Structures are given as C-alpha cells and as structure tokens.
Amino acid sequence: MSKVVVLNDKLEKAGELDLPSKYAEVNPHNLYLYVKSYLASLRANTAHTKGRSDVSGGGKKPWRQKGRGGARAGSTRTNVWVGGAVAFGPTNERNYFQKVNKKQKRLALERALADKAAKGVLFTADSLAIESGKTKDANAVIKKLGVKDALIVKDLLDEKTLLAYRNLANCYVVDVTEVNAYLVSVFNAVIMEKSVLESITKEG
C-alpha cells in the first residue's frame, strides 16, 4: 500500500495516509505517454533548413552531360554541393504536438504520486505557506525533511510563499491547477497541502 507521510504544524512526521490502491495499479505506460507529450510541447520548433524548392539558383545545368570524364550534374543546388539544399533537414513547419486525453493525464498523475508514495517521499501538511516570505525559512523546510529537492503544491499560491521558494534552485512551487505528472516525476520529493491531496484523490 502506498503511504503519504502526514506532517504536523512543525513539519514533523505525525502519521500516514493511504493512497487509493488503484493508483499503484495504473499502467506506467500512461506516465510515459504523458511525459513524452509534455516534453514535446516544450520544443521551440525554430530549427529550419532549406530544401531543393527553397534555395535560389541552380536552374542551369553546370556542364554538359557527357564527354568531360567527370560525374554528371544537373544543378549546383543539390545537397552534395556547397551552397546547395539540405536533404531531409528540419523545418519550422513541423508540429510536435502529441495528444493525450484527460483520462490519460489523470492516470499519469496517479501513477506518479503512487511512485513517490512507495518511496516515502510524498508529504502532506495542512499549510505550506511561508508567511515571512524569506528564502531561509523556505530552505529550512527542505532541510528539515531531509530531501534533495522538492515540488511544493499549494491550494492557492500566495506571493510571499512564491518569493520565499523562488530563489531555491532545488525547489519549485505551484498551485493545484499547475501540478502534473511530469513535475511530480522529476522532483525527488513532493509536498502537498491536504486540500490539494484531497482534491486530486477525489477526482480519481
């Protein structure tokens, strides 16, 4: 059974919660498909090369077909010539979008959470707000839990908490609308507010 570590107000371990057993039964291929789709959506699609129809010049045959003793050539803009076209090169017309439906997104998130819970690095607390807005207080949270890096998921993201975590290279803070299977997967630990966890498990 996948367990969620429950933290008290002092961010000390106070107990455990069970994730729905079906989370661990989700086919990991759903997680793979979502991560693949997510990373594809980040591609800028700026690489572009010119094909035979794009390069200028080359309309005239450079030399006669026979009698010179050399290889025949019909244009100076084929891909074997300097200044010629590129064969099978990337173009900015390519669309990298990969469709993933809502059900697969939900299943991917469930599997990602189950994996973290199985490793004992899925935490939940009533509140994760940093009222001081200071980075040292945010860093103290991570040190206290003894994790390398963490994804912080709040129900409503306030400005002070965002400022507190923003300067930490090993942390990323989002609200419940932004959490996804990719973010859960790439961080060593995930810390959620209880309301967020309840919202996610209720949807599942």
Curated annotation (Swiss-Prot):
GO terms for cellular component: ribonucleoprotein complex; ribosome. Pfam families: Ribosomal_L4. Keywords: Ribonucleoprotein, Ribosomal protein, RNA-binding, rRNA-binding. GO terms for molecular function: rRNA binding; structural constituent of ribosome. It comes from the Bacteria. GO terms for biological process: translation. Residues 49-75 are annotated as: Disordered. Belongs to the universal ribosomal protein uL4 family. One of the primary rRNA binding proteins, this protein initially binds near the 5'-end of the 23S rRNA. It is important during the early stages of 50S assembly. It makes multiple contacts with different domains of the 23S rRNA in the assembled 50S subunit and ribosome. PANTHER family: 50S RIBOSOMAL PROTEIN L4, LARGE RIBOSOMAL SUBUNIT PROTEIN UL4M. Part of the 50S ribosomal subunit. This is Large ribosomal subunit protein uL4. It comes from Campylobacter jejuni subsp. jejuni serotype O:2 (strain ATCC 700819 / NCTC 11168). The gene is rplD.
